[in-house]
Swiss-Prot record:
Signal peptide interval: 1-20
GO molecular function: signaling receptor activity; ubiquitin protein ligase binding
Stretches assigned to the Extracellular side: 21-194
CDD domains listed in its UniProt record: TNFRSF5 (cd13407)
GO CC, any one term: intracellular membrane-bounded organelle
Topology class, membrane: Single-pass type I membrane protein
Gene: CD40
Cytoplasmic membrane side: 216-274
Organism from which the protein derives: Callithrix jacchus (White-tufted-ear marmoset)
Subunit structure: Monomer and homodimer. Interacts with TRAF1, TRAF2, TRAF3, TRAF5 and TRAF6. Interacts with TRAF6 and MAP3K8; the interaction is required for ERK activation.
Disulphides: 26-37, 38-51, 41-59, 62-77, 83-103, 105-119, 111-116, 125-143
Listed name of the protein: Tumor necrosis factor receptor superfamily member 5
Residues that carry a glycan: 153
Major site of localization recorded for this protein: membrane
Keywords, alphabetical: Disulfide bond, Glycoprotein, Immunity, Membrane, Receptor, Repeat, Signal, Transmembrane, Transmembrane helix
Length: 274
């Protein structure tokens, strides 16, 4: 009864040794083909023939301008990338049999995508704006407006805003303040003083002239002058008579003496008597 199972086991072992079971997985850097684990071609080499039971995998190196950068079973190598100068590209690093060409943009340009298949010119910051961040091979220029005290008078993709000139540090005077597009204008100190002193002197002279004109007009106005009288003493003769003649007042016209004719009596107006 026990012979039959034992015979089956023996026959199974015999068959498995004559016809081994094909492998289901291969080691690292191998590939499975035709129930065989064949070695992969090393980087920089391409596959020519798969391995057999009696031969190893056959590989050949990539030609000039070609590369393969991994262990592979590729039958063709990859072509190096072409850095087209018409698209603004240039070769930064030549490729080898295991590396590709590295393309970058020419000076003053940046890539339009991560793959960097073409380039465009940097954006320039216009006057009144300065460069906050200079463009790189993969990013464009970032501009910012010039703050107070700084200016930019050119369109540039590299220049930042520059500070206004400090005239006092050069022994000069500021004649015109700067703007976001222009620098401060400096000049000699003497000129600035003249610009200040001359208007002041002209103002003083004008005021003096006005005073003189006013005084002259006041002098020309007619003045009401009271008649001047002058007491003229006269000697009284010790002549006999009932009524001696009193002293005669000489009336002055405009403070000038007026002669009285002989034989005429001096008369005093009624108002003066009152």
């Amino acid at each position: 009864m026990f012979r039959l199972p034992l015979q089956c086991v023996l026959w199974g072992c015999l068959l498995s040794s004559v016809h081994p079971e094909p492998p289901t997985a291969c080691r690292e850097k191998q590939y499975l083909i035709n129930s065989q684990c064949c070695s992969l071609c090393q980087p920089g080499w391409k596959l020519v023939n798969d391995c057999t039971e009696v031969t190893e995998t056959e590989c050949l190196p990539c030609g000039k301008g070609e590369f393969l950068d991994t262990w592979n079973r590729e039958t063709h190598c990859h072509q190096h990338k072409y850095c087209d100068p018409n698209l603004g590209l240039r070769v930064q690093q030549e490729g080898t049999s295991v590396t590709d060409n590295i393309c970058v943009c020419k000076e003053g340009r940046h890539c339009t995508s991560k793959a960097c298949e073409s380039c465009v010119l940097y954006h320039s910051c216009s006057p009144g704006f300065g460069v906050k961040q200079i463009a790189t091979g993969v990013s464009d220029t970032i501009c910012e407006p010039c703050p107070v005290g700084f200016f930019s008078n050119v369109s540039s993709a590299f220049e930042k805003c520059r500070p206004w000139t400090r005239c006092e540090t050069k022994g000069l005077a500021e004649q015109q303040a700067g703007t976001d597009k222009t620098d401060a204008v400096c000049g000699p100190q003497n000129r600035l003083r003249l610009l200040v002193v001359i208007p002041i002197m002209l103002g003083i002279l004008f005021a003096i002239l006005l005073v003189l004109v006013f005084i002259k007009k006041v002098d020309r106005k007619p003045q009401d002058k009271a008649p001047c009288t002058k007491q003229i003493p006269q000697e009284i003769d010790d002549l006999p008579g009932p009524n001696p003649t009193p002293p005669v007042q000489e009336t002055l016209h405009g403070c000038q003496p007026v002669a009285q004719e002989d034989g005429k009596e001096s008369r005093i107006s009624v108002q003066e008597r009152q």
